[in-house]
Amino acid sequence: LLMDKINSLEINKTGLCYMNFNVRTYRAERQKVWDQFSSKNWVTPTSNLTMENFYFDMASHKFVISPRGNGVDCHRTWEALYLRTIPIVRASTHMNGFTDLPILFVNDWSELNYNRLQQFYETVQNKFFNLDKMKISYWKQRILNAKNTCLINR
């Protein structure tokens, strides 16, 4: 897997915040986010990269801006976690089960600034996070446990 290859490299987190997404997907939010952050000197905005360059760039940053896509979340959030980069997402009820993962939740994109990123990174950089929730085996076991509980409580 390409992400495994990139994860096997010792990539320094030289950039603070990475931004790479298609503004034509869920334009109502993404265009505003792009316009708001593309000129910030602490954000690296890019587009139209090969998958390998995209993953490498993401892995070399501490954070990645991950606005929702066609659905209520975005593949970038999960790719970022896998690449040990902290995704920044809008807080929503569908993400309540993931507050124990290294994700920076914002209620509004206007909350995002250089100081907030630095402070958040300081609080999480040396913490251990159990990323089992990213594995299908975790969810299969949760479903089996729930099924067994239902059968026992009949």
Residue ranges and their predicted role:
Residues L1-W78, Y82-F105, R116-R154:
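Nucleotide-sugar donor-binding catalytic core of glycosyltransferases
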Residues N107-W109:
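Active-site donor-binding loop signature of nucleotide-sugar glycosyltransferases
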Residues N113:
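GIY-YIG nuclease catalytic motif and its immediate N-terminal context
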